[in-house]
Amino acid sequence: MQKLVFFIFSIVLVFSFKNDKPAYIIYNSKGKKVSFFKMKKELKNKELIFFGEIHNNPIAHWLQLELTQELGKSKDLILGAEMFESDNQKGLNLYLNDSIDSKGLDTVVRLWSNYKTDYKPLVDYAKRNKLPFIATNIPRRFASMVYKKGGFEVLDSLSADEKLWVAPLPFPFDSEIPGYKAMLNMFPGHGGPEIVKAQASKDATMAHFILQNIESNHIFLHYNGSY
């Protein structure tokens, strides 16, 4: 299995554009401030980068595009995002291959409400540079099934074609993962375990499609919510 290296920097956003106050500050895993270009220098030798964004934050989305463009100057990229569901891959490919326009994309792909401002620049960058853009997330209706039924077993009822859009079943689940434990604390009582399992179905599917599409001598840059 290929060695996978992750995004190990934290970006603190500062909502001011005055000369003496930067719009963002980047820290490495040791808590040391680093410049954007220092971060880029370290990241360009990695195979897999997770960019954990703050949804709907303009600075975070601007940094996503800046980092993508900078890495693309010296490395071959594969892009992917949780904001696109796996059953929409064919429609996304049609747009990337110039078979449909933006209006056509809006009819065949379930786009987030902030797509035009926050994700279209990334998709269009991939389109201009003929890069793959992988729709990694599980279809939302399947995650909803897991939540409502309270278990992964409900995914066994999917058709053979539908199962191609999720991680191979059964997939491992560890409720002791810190992120899942924190989620349980956020949703105590009824519904908490179901929410965690629904999230786990998303995580497993995203991991599956990342591993399915990662290539040697490339960087797979994945956009997802901060974790």
Which ranges hold each PLM region?
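Short hydrophobic beta-strand that contains or immediately precedes a catalytic carboxylate
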Residues: 49-52, 221-224
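A substrate-binding/cap region within the structured catalytic cores of diverse enzymes
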Residues: 78, 90-215
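Bacterial Sec-dependent signal peptides at the C-terminal "C-region" and cleavage site
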Residues: 3, 7, 11-23
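Solvent-exposed loop/turn segments at secondary-structure junctions
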Residues: 54-58, 84-88, 139-143, 226-227
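Short, flexible loop segments at the rims of nucleotide/cofactor-binding pockets, characterized by
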Residues: 25-31, 55-58, 110-113, 196-201
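Membrane-embedded segments
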Residues: 55-62, 69-80, 86-96
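N- or domain-start disorder-to-order transition segments that initiate the globular core
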Residues: 17-46
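Extracytoplasmic/secreted envelope proteins and their assembly/folding machinery
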Residues: 36, 40, 61-68, 119-123, ...
